[in-house]
């Protein structure tokens, strides 16, 4: 990952709407009311919700406990052989019970855009609006075998309806539903997560939702396993299955190997090796992932 990529992450964070920045770290103490254990709020997914990088967890965004309001902002860059991905977003957590999130996703097609007839550097865009509700359990406390369980919804709106129609997508807009279970086993320093997502998204929704022959929500799995070397440093891996709806291009499952480090209580950096398989006729899309999160 180049220094230029790190600058791009910083630039993404600076481009967030002003309302996302009104909760400055200086006010974190009264909102946090003691706060969660370091890193137990997870980081920000590419869809803006709290979790890992690729997989959604049941964690609620921000450092606040059940007595406070918290949140986070993030910027993410993924550099692949034939594409560049950027996303940024904001999430708010209310009393460690409810999470509301927003993310903007951008996929720069670089030279592939010319091959697809879109023009070099054509960028696919999508907005993701999310809500999550914690139903039971706690990531850290309570019964050692009882995970934190949450349900969630993510409504996605592509900005490229003409492209979606051209590749055979059924609709430029769609909604995912999921249920997640997450637990940190403190004595073993191991975090485990399992999520079942009901979706018909093509390439996360950037190529629309469903097709003429596959227009039903189908369950997909998102799993994460991480080991905490210290209070500040975590390594792990994730696996996310994907639907394969489009006849024009194969869609593969996603895998990553990541490391997350808490620079401070409020700032976490995550780096990963990602394998996103085939994207819109371009195979072997493996590369580097870098994300910066600021949480309060």
Question: What spans do the regions from the language model cover?
Answer:
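Sec/Tat signal peptide C-region and signal peptidase I cleavage site
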Residues: 19-28
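Transmembrane beta-barrel domains of Gram-negative outer membranes and organellar outer membranes
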Residues: 28-190, 199-200, 230-233, 243-245, ...
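Bacterial N-terminal signal peptides that target proteins for export
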Residues: 1-14
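Surface-exposed beta-strand-turn/loop segments characteristic
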Residues: 110, 203-209
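Transmembrane alpha-helix/helix-exit interface in multi-pass inner-membrane proteins
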Residues: 193-195
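Outer membrane beta-barrel transmembrane domains
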Residues: 207-296
């Amino acid at each position: 990952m180049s220094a230029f990529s790190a600058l791009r992450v910083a630039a993404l964070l600076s481009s967030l709407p002003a309302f996302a920045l009104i909760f400055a770290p200086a006010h974190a103490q009264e909102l946090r009311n003691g706060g969660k254990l370091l890193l137990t709020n997870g980081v920000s997914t590419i869809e803006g919700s709290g979790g890992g990088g690729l997989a959604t967890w049941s964690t609620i965004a921000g450092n606040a406990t059940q007595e406070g309001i918290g949140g986070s902002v993030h910027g993410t860059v993924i550099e692949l052989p034939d594409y560049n991905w950027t996303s940024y977003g904001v999430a708010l957590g209310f009393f460690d019970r409810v999470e509301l999130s927003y993310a903007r996703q951008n996929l720069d097609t670089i030279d592939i855009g010319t091959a697809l007839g879109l023009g070099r550097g054509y960028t696919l865009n999508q907005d993701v609006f999310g809500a999550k509700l914690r139903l039971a359990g706690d990531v850290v406390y309570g019964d050692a075998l009882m995970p934190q369980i949450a349900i969630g919804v993510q409504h996605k709106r592509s900005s490229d309806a003409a492209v979606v129609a051209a590749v055979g997508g059924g609709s430029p807009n769609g909604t995912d539903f999921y249920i997640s279970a997450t637990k940190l086993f403190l004595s073993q320093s191991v975090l485990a997560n399992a999520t079942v997502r009901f979706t018909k998204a093509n390439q996360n929704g950037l190529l629309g939702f469903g097709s003429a022959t596959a227009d039903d929500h189908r369950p997909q799995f998102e799993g994460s396993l991480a080991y905490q070397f210290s209070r500040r440093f975590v390594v792990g891996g994730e696996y996310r299955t994907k639907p394969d709806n489009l006849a024009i291009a194969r869609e593969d499952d996603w895998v990553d190997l990541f490391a997350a480090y808490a620079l401070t209580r409020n700032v976490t950096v995550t780096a990963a090796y990602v394998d996103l398989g085939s994207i819109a006729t371009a195979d072997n899309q493996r590369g580097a992932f870098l994300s910066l999160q600021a949480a309060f």
